[in-house]
Amino acid sequence: MSDVERTEFEIPGGIPPRRNGGQGRAADTNVDANLKPDEYDAEVTLRPKSLTEFIGQPKVRDQLSLVLTGAKNRGVVPDHVLLSGPPGLGKTTMAMIIAQELGTSLRMTSGPALERAGDLAAMLSNLMEGDVLFIDEIHRIARPAEEMLYMAMEDFRIDVIVGKGPGATSIPLEIPPFTLVGATTRSGMLTGPLRDRFGFTAQMEFYDVPDLTKVVKRTAKILDVGIDNDAAVEIASRSRGTPRIANRLLRRVRDFAEVHADGHITMGAANAALIVFDVDEVGLDRLDRAVLDALIRGHGGGPVGVNTLAVAVGEEPGTVEEVCEPYLVRAGMIARTGRGRVATAAAWRHLGLEPPEGTIGDY
């Protein structure tokens, strides 16, 4: 029997055991949905180029198709578009597709990069008619730039201030009609005036396993990697409903299959690789389990404040709150209460422990 047919693999040094505790760094996790700097080039090659090629998000795709087709038929630029949702679900890809579908150029920037009104004015003055301007993390745009954006979105003009003090003058500058696509992971942080200027808003949802399986298979085809269906399902089921994580895990499993087998990804190769990279059967990694361990073994299941949990696992509070906690809450393993975070019965059982009587979710 060849290595690729086995369900067990011999790895130099052995497969590291899963630990329910221990420390983890956000930069090392394979299940952080934020884009890592060294992943940009890989992501570009994997992005779909059209709405029909885009997998998942059927409601958003159908709505956007209507908006774009209607605008093209009328010969006008589409309304400004706001895409909301957690990282890794395809907001940037959707902005690229919008420009592709319209046959126009895409200009990209981010909210944190627009610190002054002049930064935004420079970008707007270089737009051509019909261009798509994509602002990622638009909720982080500086107030002076945001106020300039109001007029640009509504009237396609801006006022440029020349000079300082009493001698300063305002020069109106017409800009070509354009479509702004804003992306945000925190739509609640958008000001009302900015949110109201978007003609179309869409909420990107987490993916189910069937759609994520399609994503894994499509990526494997692009990467020229053979993969069995059950292996694709296994990778998808551990990807937290997020295509970016699914693609990252597939690349790690590919590495394993190339080193320890013949490069073809079987169920055995997928399982063994995900053990090596410390991603368990429900998508938790070492840091997630360390948080649960600190909450349950260290504090009896809570309630515990996020700062205390962060100290216990050796992480920054922001990392625990933004990287770990959202998925643990969505997976039903942590509940937020007025007094702090509380472990649910599912969390106790995930660590192989019996939950005390009265634990949340213990029916």
Curated annotation (Swiss-Prot):
Residues 1-32 are annotated as: Disordered. This is Holliday junction branch migration complex subunit RuvB. The RuvA-RuvB-RuvC complex processes Holliday junction (HJ) DNA during genetic recombination and DNA repair, while the RuvA-RuvB complex plays an important role in the rescue of blocked DNA replication forks via replication fork reversal (RFR). RuvA specifically binds to HJ cruciform DNA, conferring on it an open structure. The RuvB hexamer acts as an ATP-dependent pump, pulling dsDNA into and through the RuvAB complex. RuvB forms 2 homohexamers on either side of HJ DNA bound by 1 or 2 RuvA tetramers; 4 subunits per hexamer contact DNA at a time. It holds the Pfam family RuvB_C. DNA binds at R336, R341. Residues 281-363 are annotated as: Head domain (RuvB-H). One of its GO terms (cellular component) is Holliday junction resolvase complex. It is an enzyme of class 3 (hydrolase). NCBIfam families: PRK00080.1, ruvB. Belongs to the RuvB family. Residues 27-207 are annotated as: Large ATPase domain (RuvB-L). Mg(2+) binds at T92. It comes from the Bacteria. GO terms for molecular function: ATP binding; ATP hydrolysis activity; four-way junction DNA binding; four-way junction helicase activity. Has 3 domains, the large (RuvB-L) and small ATPase (RuvB-S) domains and the C-terminal head (RuvB-H) domain. The head domain binds DNA, while the ATPase domains jointly bind ATP, ADP or are empty depending on the state of the subunit in the translocation cycle. During a single DNA translocation step the structure of each domain remains the same, but their relative positions change. It is found in: Cytoplasm. The gene is ruvB.
